[in-house]
Amino acid sequence: MNRFSAKEYNYKILFSSNNNIDIYPYLVDSTGDKSIYSIGPLHGRSFIVSCKGDRYIVSKGNGLSYTQYDFLFTGELSSLGDDTLGLLLLEDATRDFLVGQDVAKLGVKINRMECVIELDKKLFLPNGHILNPILLQYSVECPYRICDAPFMDQQLLCLEIEKWERYNTKNYRKKHLIAADVMINNLRVMHDNNILHNAIHEQNYTWALELLDFELGRTPNHPYKKSDYERHVPSLYHRELFQTYVIINYIAWVLNEEISYKEIDNLFAEYGFNIQKYKLKENYYGKN
């Protein structure tokens, strides 16, 4: 875990889950007198800003945890684009917060959204735009994501895995099957409610099996603003099966557990997902 200096700013609240939260309006700044922490190289713009009881408070959009610069402008999509590494855009923060709340209401375990705030500071982008930094603040049971396994203390990893027994209603002996059951059930719940996460991978699940990062997602309450994006939604559900499959495989490898792909396919089938229907046909006439 690496410490970074940060500076505190005045702010206004754009969204809040409740009034009883502490807010951490910090940006990375080598001259600042606040401390924030990055727990690994894959958490580019997310930092631990505090701990409350058994939960970690995370802030997203506070600047970069790599390079000597706090923000790096890329201007993707067009010359007028505002995409900037280290920065969280208002539209993305809003969607992350609101879609996440929709998913949580269905019983899927996610990060607990706390607030979206706008800082009283101006950032001057090379395209001529002036933005105020936006921060998304949330809490998690475990700050380490599945992809962080190479950087975790093994004792801490084992402690997180032991907690999975609370979900082991089917008495699995292999730990990756417990995780698989949780994740596939999450898919079933989301897809049955016309929810697309659209970014399921090992960086967006924690070792407490919390699903994160909903800024690319959509729900019936918060559909995509562009009709062309909405039109493609039905075709995107399928790939989430295989994105989840990759995470399950990753976990099995990390835990050095032998994985049976037939067993995983059968587990998908239990939840109504037929992996076999995606296999290629052996000849032109469709005979398998």
Q: Where do the language-model regions lie?
A:
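Short, glycine/acidic-rich beta->alpha junctions
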Residues: E91-R95, V182, H197-A199
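Catalytic activation segment of kinase domains across protein kinase-like and atypical kinase folds
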Residues: K121-Y138, I195-N249
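Regulatory N- and C-terminal appendages and interdomain linkers associated
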Residues: M1-G40, S65, L80, K174, ...
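Intrinsically disordered, low-complexity linkers and terminal regions
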Residues: W164-Y167, T219
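Activation segment of protein kinase catalytic domains, centered on the conserved DFG
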Residues: N168-I178
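Protein kinase catalytic-loop region centered on the HRD/HxD motif
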Residues: R188-I195
